[in-house]
Structure formats: structure tokens, C-alpha cells
Design a protein with these regions (language model features):
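Short active-site oxyanion
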Residues: 2-4, 182-184, 206-209
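Short amphipathic alpha-helical segments embedded in low-complexity Lys/Glu-rich regions
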Residues: 190-193, 238-241, 530-532, 567-568
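Non-catalytic terminal extensions of PLP-dependent enzymes
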Residues: 2-4, 12-19, 28-40, 45, ...
Length: 711
């Protein structure tokens, strides 16, 4: 590894004797230094507090030619003699040796060995790629180290990622300590796989699973299709803007749940623990965060285990006002359920795409019949893991844990929360049409008038007060949910927040999203009159200021009714005949009117309400088996009413199934997809990604949606 720098007071830079590069204190963020040298004056200027706040635990030396008392936070006093330079170098070396987490440290050392290999992968450290011009370009683009770190598990020096030995095991133990789990498993093919690992380890045919209707499709795949478990669905909320909300409070009532069990498995209705597993979204895609303590206290005694799908959170325990939502920080006893938490590290933590982790917290039920031992979980783990893992992915998970260790993780997320608050304030100051999704008034005072430090430390500034008009969610209890401060959620015109009804004019969020992408800004997702931007410690003031500026510019285009060719040139140039002479407001009005004509906001809401759920006539596993056997036919969604779905269907994002295999097409779900079909034809260039239904062009040139149903 390249030697790290030493940071020093500017007056000391030229006086330090070291083979390392010496940089001034003002020229570093301290991520590239292994030791710090300050003067007595520096020690009184606040630098020691700054260094402590980083959480990096850097060795700090005070340079003084006179005897001085050793300040707190200083390793030693030096005056420049040769022995003391050696002490400085020794401290820097020790810092470097302890800096890297277990697996990544071993990986870097192994790469430096430059072994000659006759094992997989066949590109042999990139040499194969370099034998062709395209391969050479590929190699140069990614850089040497990624190819050298892509190696075979034939050499045991790096440990085993499947049976968890060596430095791989050490890395996962380290992550478990950082995240307060009993065990942690690194997953290299996303939380879609992580959820399947957990559900395949716990569920079998005939088991009952308490199932959040908001769950990501991977939970349907693992629990219902692969394991064949029987779901008891929990209805969830959608608001008029299109945001995904939480489960209704009444769904956590024991008698209500036992009645639901009587409808699907009466023989299990009176069992002490009727559910083998409950699967709950700890945080929804749109930033509704649950109180984990409430969930466990209300339904935990009915469940052997609870899986908190935390794909869209995972950082909550590092943010004090979110800590109550973390299942991993809870004190649990032998009467509580076992806990699994799956996290998409790549979403808002520091990980390559596809990096995920499973946290297991169940030592409190060890020895009970319901306990899931490591060997059983690992059996499911190996069902879904590749025997040819990409080591840089595993290393990224290891480094992510190191980044979050101790004060470092808390500081990084505190800065993220504060930056998000400042950005919301800037939007409120600059924009008239786009509004941050937060309570407009708290205790009679405008949200933005509170100091940022106050907003960042008190959850009530992000809480969903039951019945409050601003959020439009129904069925919530007090202190049940709050807005994730690290999800910048905006609403667009089109909904009267006081009534929840459509206004005369609207700006569908997909049009704003297209404009932002045209101008180099990529939002996470949008739906109806809502748009989402993910915030992480990677953000900067400059980056978010650019976003605010683009929002203000788009508002000006709305006010000026600018030509569409000027605002969305890519869409206009692709469909010049359809959008000839269109203005921006004209496009907004047509799309808004389409939403109104189908009442899309209410269709979307109804799909996740129990009274509108599609009828269940088959176990999802049986319906899927019929699909695999070819006992299906492809029909137009328009003609699918009353037919049994062979595939789950959904728009992506968010990846939440609207109809599940074995359910009957009809009602709100069918009308919702017909509304999407109408939009595909009426407004080309704004088609959503649909899965489980298929767009085909008919003889009349119109696109029609089809789906597989059982014969």
C-alpha cells in the first residue's frame, strides 16, 4: 500500500523529517494521513476537537521546543530529535497497519504478492483482455487493481466465502459487531438474494407468513413461490401524491390477525405463535420508517421470527433520532421473536452495486425449537451464492463496516442529515411548485424557521401525525411512522393537499424527472406527483445546490410555458410528430388529465387496501408451477378479468407486486394497468418499466398489455 501522508501545521511542514509526504492541516480532510503534528497554538484552536470528531483515531503529536503539558487527545510531545521522528514514523506505521478491515487487508496483501496463476478467472489478472484492442480499452478503463483482485477461490489465503472461514469470516464478524448483530452474512447478488436466503431458511409449504403487502417482489419469490408458504397480507397505505406508506395500525391488533388466520388456515388460528415468519419493510422506498420496537411489542409474540427488509435503510442506528427504528439495537428476551435484517448496502451505504448483508439477531432464543441455526441458514445461503464470487464486492462490504465503525459512522450520517435539512430549506426558499415532504408547521412555527441542529435531533419534525393533511396517509397511529431524513422527497403540483383531490392543473413528476436527466441530474424514482432523491454521506453542498437550481429553472419553464423542444429535447426529437408545437404546460396538462380520467391515485391506493386485494384462489407456488409447465395462455389485460394470474405483475420501480401468482385479475389492479396502457399510447417517451405484463404492438399500431393467465 502506498504510504499515507503526515499532516502538520503549515509552519512545520518544511521542518518535519520523514520519507512521507507532509501536507498542511488545511490541505487535507484527514482521510489520506497516518499522523498529525500540531503546535501548541493549534491545540488551542479547536483542531483536537475536529480530529476527534472525524472518528479516525489518528495519532497526534504536539511539536514544541519547550516542555509543555500533554493535552488530552495528543499522543506525545516531540521537539525534533531523531528518536522522536522514529516515534512519529512508528505511530504512522501502526495506524496504517490497523486501518484496513480484515478481508480487504488480506486482499490487498495478496494482490501485492503477484502470484502466477493457472486457475480461474481466465483473464489472468487482465492479461487476456490486453491481447485485443477492445480488451485493452476495457482494461485501461477500469484499471489494473480490479483485474488483479478478481481471483479464484482455489487459493485458500483469502478464506472461504461460502463456508465462512479465514479473513472472510473475520470480516463478517467485524460487520456484526459494528451493526450490533449476532451474526452477519455478506451477500453478493443483492438484497433480492438476501431475502430469499432468509425466507428459504425459515419457511416451508404450509407455514404461515405475515406479509407486508408493500414487500419487494424478492420476498414473494422467496417466501411464496420458492418456499410455498401461505401469506396473511397486511394492508398498507398510499397517499394521493403516489408515495408508498406503511401498514395500517389496526393490522397489528392480535384479534384482527387471528381472524385473518381463520380465513386462510383455521387450524393455526389459536396457536401461541401462528406465524413462522413476519416480513416487514423497515423503511419503504419512499421513506416511511417503522418503529421496530412497536412492531415487536404488538406482533412479535405471534411470530417465530421477523424479517425486517431494510433494503432502503440500514443506516438508522447511526442517526440518534432514528435509533428507535433499528431492530438491531433492541434489547430482546426469550419471549421475543428472532430477528433478521437484510440491508442493501449499495443503496445508501458504501458498497458496489449488488452488495447486501444479512444480520441475524436471535441468540436470545437459542435452544428453542424455533431457533434457526447457522448451518441451516448457510444451507440456504449456498443455494443462492455463486461459487465464483467477485472479491471486490466482498471487500466493499468489509470496508463499509469499517467506515461505519464508531464515531466515524455517526459523524458521516449526522452531516448527511444536516445537509438534507439545509437543502429542504433552500427548496422552500427558492421554489413555489415543488415542496419538500415534511410537516409544514410544527408547534405553530414553520418547519424551516427552526435551527438545523434542532431539526436534525428531534424526530417530531419528521413524524407523521395521524390525520394531518400534509401527508395524506390514512390509518396511522401516533409515533408509528416518520419520514426518513435521508430521503429527499418532493411533491409536484396536481394534488390539493387539504382535500386529497386533483387540482385543475398538475405537473406529473415523470416530466420533472425527464428534465433533470436532460440536465445531468438523476433522481432515484418518481411516481404520479412525487419524486425521490437519495441522500448519503457522499453528497456535497455544491451538488445539492445544483439540484435546487435545476428545480427553480424548471419552475421558470412552467411559468413561461416554454416550448417542449427546448425543455425536453430528447423526447421531442424522438417523437417530433406527436409533440410538434407542444409547450411544457400542454404536456403537463395532458398527462395530468390522463391521471384524472382514470383516477390513478385512487387506483394505486386501492390495490394495497384489503377490501380491494385481488381474490386468492391458488397458492402462489402452485400457480407458478402451472406457468413453468406451460399450462397458461397470454391474454390482453383488458380481457383478463376473472382469470388467474400466472405471473406477478408490477411497475418498476418500486418493484412491489400489484397482483401475485394465484390471484385473480380484475378490479383496481386491472384498471391500473389499463391506465398505464393508455399512457403508453397517448404519451410516448414516458412509458414505465413493467414486469410480469408484456407490451406488444397490435396490427393497428397500438401498444397493448398482455399477461399470462392459467388455462
Amino acid at each position: 500500500m502506498k504510504s499515507m501522508n503526515i499532516a502538520a501545521s503549515s509552519e512545520l511542514v518544511s521542518r518535519l523529517s520523514s520519507h512521507r509526504r507532509v501536507v498542511a492541516l488545511g490541505d487535507t480532510d484527514f482521510t489520506d494521513v497516518a499522523a498529525v503534528v500540531i503546535t501548541a497554538a493549534d491545540s488551542r484552536s479547536g483542531i483536537l476537537a475536529l480530529l476527534k470528531r472525524t472518528g479516525f483515531h489518528l495519532p497526534v503529536f504536539l511539536y514544541s521546543e519547550h516542555a509543555v503539558e500533554l493535552p488530552a487527545g495528543v499522543t506525545a510531545v516531540i521537539n525534533g530529535n531523531e528518536q522522536q521522528w522514529l516515534e512519529l514514523e512508528s505511530a504512522a506505521c501502526q495506524y496504517e497497519e490497523n486501518l484496513l478491515p480484515p478481508f480487504y487487508d488480506t486482499l490487498t496483501q495478496y494482490v501485492e504478492m503477484a502470484n502466477s496463476t493457472f486457475a480461474c478467472p481466465g483473464h489472468q489478472h487482465g492479461a487476456f483482455f490486453k491481447k485485443h484492442p477492445a480488451g485493452r480499452h476495457f482494461y485501461d478503463f477500469f484499471g489494473e487493481n480490479v483485474f488483479r483482485a478478481d481471483m479464484c477461490n482455489a487459493d485458500v489465503k483469502l478464506g472461504d466465502l461460502l463456508i465462512h472461514e479465514g479473513s472472510a469470516k473475520d470480516a463478517q464478524k467485524f460487520a456484526a459487531k459494528v451493526f450490533h448483530a449476532d451474526k452477519t452474512y455478506f451477500v453478493l447478488n443483492g438484497t433480492s438474494a438476501a431475502n430469499k436466503v432468509v425466507t428459504n431458511a425459515l419457511l416451508t409449504r404450509g407455514d404461515l407468513v405475515l406479509f407486508d403487502r408493500n414487500n419487494h417482489k424478492s420476498n414473494h419469490h422467496g417466501a411464496l413461490i420458492q418456499a410455498g408458504a401461505t401469506p396473511v397480507y397486511l394492508e398498507a397505505s398510499r397517499n394521493p401524491f403516489g408515495f408508498i406508506g406503511g401498514i395500517d395500525a389496526h393490522c397489528f391488533n392480535e384479534e384482527y390477525l387471528r381472524q385473518q388466520i381463520r380465513d386462510v388456515a383455521p387450524e393455526k388460528a389459536e396457536l401461541p405463535r401462528s406465524f413462522r415468519l413476519a416480513i416487514i419493510q423497515l423503511g419503504t422506498y419512499d421513506g416511511t420508517v417503522y418503529n421496530a420496537r412497536q412492531v415487536i411489542d404488538t406482533v412479535g409474540h405471534l411470530c417465530d421470527y421477523i424479517l425486517f427488509d431494510s433494503a432502503w435503510v440500514g443506516y438508522e442506528q447511526f442517526i440518534p433520532m432514528m435509533a428507535d427504528s433499528s431492530p438491531l439495537l433492541l434489547e430482546l428476551n426469550e419471549n421475543d421473536p428472532g430477528i433478521f435484517v437484510t440491508q442493501s448496502v449499495h443503496k445508501q451505504q458504501a458498497g458496489f452495486s449488488q452488495t447486501s448483508q444479512i444480520h441475524k439477531k436471535d441468540n436470545h432464543i437459542r435452544g428453542q425449537a424455533r431457533f434457526c441455526p447457522h448451518k441451516r441458514l448457510n444451507n440456504a445461503f449456498m443455494l443462492h451464492a455463486s461459487t465464483s464470487p467477485f472479491y471486490p464486492l466482498f471487500a466493499a462490504l468489509d470496508v463499509n463496516a469499517k467506515i461505519h465503525e464508531g464515531e466515524s459512522g455517526r459523524r458521516l450520517w449526522a452531516e448527511c442529515v444536516e445537509l438534507g435539512i439545509e437543502s429542504r430549506k433552500a427548496i422552500l426558499a427558492r421554489c413555489k411548485l415543488f415542496r419538500p415532504f415534511i410537516p409544514p408547521v410544527v408547534d405553530g412555527k414553520l418547519w424551516q424557521d427552526y435551527p438545523t441542529s434542532v431539526l436534525a435531533s428531534d424526530r417530531r419534525f419528521f413524524s407523521f401525525e395521524p390525520g394531518a393533511k400534509w401527508h395524506g396517509f390514512e390509518g396511522y397511529a401516533a409515533d408509528q411512522y416518520f419520514v426518513d431524513p435521508c430521503k429527499l422527497l418532493l411533491t409536484t403540483p396536481g394534488i390539493n393537499a387539504e382535500t386529497g383531490e386533483y387540482s385543475d392543473f398538475g405537473v406529473p413528476a415523470t416530466i420533472l424527472a425527464h428534465y433533470l436527466r436532460e440536465n445531468g441530474i438523476v433522481p432515484e424514482k418518481c411516481d404520479l406527483n412525487s419524486i425521490l432523491f437519495l441522500l448519503t454521506p457522499a453528497e456535497s453542498h455544491e451538488k445539492l445546490a445544483q439540484l435546487v437550481e435545476m428545480l427553480a429553472q424548471f419552475e421558470q419553464h412552467i411559468e413561461d410555458d416554454s416550448p417542449l423542444a427546448e425543455v425536453l429535447p430528447s423526447v421531442y426529437n424522438k417523437y417530433p410528430v406527436r409533440y410538434r408545437d407542444y409547450t411544457l404546460r400542454q404536456l403537463c396538462q395532458e398527462m395530468h388529465d390522463l391521471y384524472v380520467s382514470f383516477d390513478v391515485k385512487d387506483l394505486q391506493k386501492a390495490m394495497f387496501r384489503q377490501q380491494s386485494f385481488p381474490s386468492v384462489v391458488m397458492n402462489p407456488q402452485d400457480a407458478h408451477s402451472a406457468y413453468i409447465r406451460g399450462e397458461v395462455e397470454l391474454v390482453r389485460i383488458r380481457d383478463a378479468e376473472g382469470r388467474i394470474a400466472a405471473e406477478g405483475a408490477l411497475p418498476y420501480p418500486p418493484g412491489v407486486l400489484c397482483v401475485v401468482p394465484g390471484e385473480v385479475w380484475g378490479g383496481a389492479v386491472q384498471r391500473y394497468f389499463l391506465a398505464l396502457e393508455e399512457g403508453v399510447n397517448l404519451l410516448p417517451g414516458f412509458s414505465p418499466e413493467l414486469q410480469g405484463v408484456y407490451s406488444e404492438t397490435d396490427a393497428d399500431g397500438m401498444k397493448r398489455l398482455y399477461g399470462y393467465v392459467l388455462k
